[in-house]
């Protein structure tokens, strides 16, 4: 079987020493720059569309996300490599469904979830990917890159369309995440999976730092202060912009 069809687990077994690129290497930064350019171009294009065009664009985004997820399941199953880890219960995978719901409703809560969770989650995945042992021309590598680009793009499109984040909706977002974490935590124990990164650091440098601070069994406690810092930088500029707008309108 060609390496194009290997999953990460298969590559680890057959070629454990293979590394396509190191984090923040020239290759990694070049590919990331291409992804940023694609997202920026999509935002500009979306901003210029009328309301009907924007709705169609979001439908297309949802269709691409679903197709991307199905591509992973169909090809991994067809090659006998499907595993429970592929169930769409990772934080980014769950946001695929949030994107689909948002494309039909475009309500403030799902938009906030996408901004608060999808942006940092997908950005971290692209900046510090957990699949550097897969070749670029590999179906799982293509899926991992494309799905995270689409997930990062979705909330950026909402911003280009006029959505403005509001930190006052964050308690609801956090409550939803915590409610999801409880069943996922126990499901990880039953299936030996790592949904929400609650059952291991998966080689992620950020999670390794948390493990060094809080211990390998309690690293996930560090998610709370880490998320608080990330949200501060994500929301404070919008808060200042809103205050400035309120002053100028008086």
PLM regions: where:
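Hydrophobic core of alpha-helical transmembrane segments in multi-pass integral membrane proteins
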Residues: 29-47, 65-70, 181-185, 224-237
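Membrane-interface loop-to-helix entry segments
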Residues: 87-91, 142-153
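Membrane-interface helix caps and helix-loop-helix hairpins in membrane proteins
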Residues: 75-85, 104-109, 130-142
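Membrane-interface helix-boundary motifs at transmembrane edges
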Residues: 45-58, 104-111, 161-171
């Amino acid at each position: 079987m060609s390496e194009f069809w290997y999953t990460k687990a298969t590559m680890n077994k057959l070629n454990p020493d293979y590394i396509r690129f190191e984090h923040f290497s020239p290759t990694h930064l070049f590919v990331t720059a291409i992804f940023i350019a694609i997202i920026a171009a999509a935002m500009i294009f979306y901003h210029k569309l009328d309301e009907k065009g924007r709705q169609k664009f979001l439908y297309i985004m949802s269709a691409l996300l679903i197709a991307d997820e199905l591509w992973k399941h169909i090809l991994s199953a067809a090659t006998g490599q499907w595993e429970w880890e592929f169930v769409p219960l990772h934080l980014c995978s769950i946001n695929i469904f949030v994107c689909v719901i948002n494309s039909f409703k475009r309500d403030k809560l799902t938009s906030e979830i996408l901004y608060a969770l999808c942006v940092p989650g997908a950005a971290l995945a692209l900046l510090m990917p957990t699949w550097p042992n897969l070749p670029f021309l590999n179906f799982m590598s293509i899926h991992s890159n494309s799905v995270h680009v689409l997930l990062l793009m979705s909330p950026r499109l909402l911003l280009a369309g006029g959505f403005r984040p509001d930190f006052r909706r964050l308690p609801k977002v956090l409550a939803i995440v915590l409610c999801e974490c409880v069943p996922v935590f126990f499901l990880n124990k039953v299936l030996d999976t790592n949904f929400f990164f609650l059952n291991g650091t998966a080689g992620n440098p950020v999670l390794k730092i948390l493990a060094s601070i809080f211990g390998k069994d309690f690293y996930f406690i560090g998610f709370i202060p880490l998320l608080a810092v990330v949200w501060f930088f994500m929301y404070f500029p919008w808060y200042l912009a809103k205050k400035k707008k309120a002053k100028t309108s008086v």
